[in-house]
Amino acid sequence: MTSRLVALLRREDGFGPVETAIAVTAVILLIPLMIAFGRMAKANTSVDAAAFMAARAASISRTGGEAQGAADAVAAAQLAQDGVSCANRSVSVDTSGFGTEPGQTALVAVSVTCRAELGDLPVPGMPSTKAFTGQYTSVIDTYRGRS
């Protein structure tokens, strides 16, 4: 009698649907997580590209004020082109290089920060926004006039 009971308890009939249900549930939970990681990677890359483009635009400006405006506009356009939605975006430009005399090497540094929105993804524990920062430094033309 005991051996028959042990054999009955060891049977694996009917475990296929249970295993499938567990596997499908795990996959369904992993898909939004993979999408979230993909979005974060895209946002990080886009913010870095925006910082690069903004620094380049600032470095070809004639004045520090123009550099700030150009960097902000280019960063916003680059992020919009890449489809990155920022809850809060800031562009910081170090324009101290515009104070140097022509003939001396001067730099302009740009930092772009974007709080990318992630709240529409159904991932438990995922913050609704995540901050990404990109920084880039570009050389101002050495022999061009500055003000």
Where are these regions (language model features)?
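Short, conserved structural patches
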Residues: T2-S3, I60, G64-S147
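Alpha-helical assembly-interface signal, strongest on the long, hydrophobic N-terminal helix that forms
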Residues: M1-A73
